[in-house]
Amino acid sequence: MKIVSQENREVLDSIRDFCAVRNHGTALENTEEPSPRAQFIIDLCNKIGLECEVDYFRSGIYHYHNLILRGSSTRMVIAHHDIVNPNSDNANDNSASVINAILLKKIVPEINVIITDGEEVGFAGSNRLSQQIKNGLFGPIEWVLNLELTGKGGKNFMIGGYTGVLTDRIKDLFNPPIKNTPASDCFPLSANGIDTNVINPLPLLTEGQSDMLNENGYLDNSSWYICHTEMDTFDKISIEDMEEFVTEVLVPIVK
């Protein structure tokens, strides 16, 4: 599969350099200045012509930076930029999701995209975002789709076990497998009454079975077990799959 457009390639190719950026540690090591990964995102958005607002805030003694790519839609997509292991590429968790969210914003400019901070250390960014949504900072928001581990799998994906308008929409469009997932940025959103779900593409198993089955076969979730390790490397994701996921799954959901 070839990348459809040169414009898409410019965004997708940035994943290699993004994976090479090293933070000092988790978001608890942040300072008042954006982390190296956050600064990379800001610079990338400037380079490709997307306006990126830095929402700096503190929670206790800790510093966080949510990155806001504002749109006119009532729909929102989020992905977290913080990490656990500073020695890892953090390719699938969650560098690919950040790049996919930016590509989606480029293709569908009206969508609201928020790149959150602090997911790995207690969901500080999404907790702040949930309060901002409730306070009307973005106008009425119908639902929030959370991108997690979106580096490989393309149009084969699963969603979390949340209920609501967003979940019904995804089921009507694709009827994917549904699985209860560990806590993510969806947790504070759902706790604050905001319609949300998490989406995670996964490649197909080449042999054997799993507990996630779609029309194409059984999904392979082995990538879940290398999150936060130095095995979560750039070579284990696919920019072709990333583009397929954005153009054939995310675009229909958000439009």
Question: What annotation goes with each model-predicted range?
Answer:
Residues 1, 40, 50-67, 75, ...:
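Catalytic phosphate/metal-binding cores of nucleic-acid and nucleotide-processing enzymes, i.e., regions
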Residues 1-35, 82, 222-232:
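N-terminal capping segment at the start of a domain
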Residues 5, 196-219:
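Short, solvent-exposed beta-strand-terminating loops
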Residues 10-14, 33-36, 40, 128, ...:
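Extracytoplasmic/secreted proteins, especially bacterial periplasmic and envelope-associated proteins
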Residues 16-72:
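A non-catalytic alpha/beta surface segment that caps or lines the substrate-entry region
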Residues 73-88:
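Glycine/charged-rich beta-loop-alpha catalytic/anionic-binding loops adjacent to active sites
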Residues 85-188:
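Acidic/histidine-rich catalytic neighborhood of metal-dependent amide-processing enzymes
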Residues 106, 208-255:
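His/Asp/Glu-rich mid-to-C-terminal helical/loop segments that flank catalytic regions of hydrolases
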